[in-house]
């Protein structure tokens, strides 16, 4: 088994996030982020909901405190069911950020660096 190491340090955040998939749009919370990846979770109203497939392409919008949004295209690195309740399913997703504008990447780098020190 090959274990992939992260290339960049991740920082803990709690940013509202919108994820657009082929099945529609969902709102979630980003829990950690780096310059090239993020972990987020969201509640799906269907208790039978399945996680997204690895390698699926999605669009993501991170609502950063201070009235700033970071938009990116991303690849689902992994996805899993975190919890199932009567009325919903909690899903977790690891994303690889693929296409981020230069301006947003610079903002993200500055934000991450500021949280590290």
Each predicted region: which residue ranges?
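C-terminal output/interaction extensions
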Residues: 13, 84-117
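Short, conserved beta-turn/loop elements at beta-strand boundaries and strand-helix junctions
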Residues: 22-24, 35-36, 79-85, 102
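Short beta-strands and strand-coil junctions in structured, solvent-facing domains, enriched
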Residues: 46-48, 82-83
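Short conserved beta-strand and strand-loop elements enriched in small hydrophobics
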Residues: 15-20, 51-69
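N-terminal helix initiation/capping motif
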Residues: 1-46, 109-117
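Short beta-strand-centered aromatic/proline hotspots
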Residues: 27-30, 72-79
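Hydrophobic core residues within well-ordered beta-strands of beta-rich domains
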Residues: 13, 26, 58, 70-72, ...
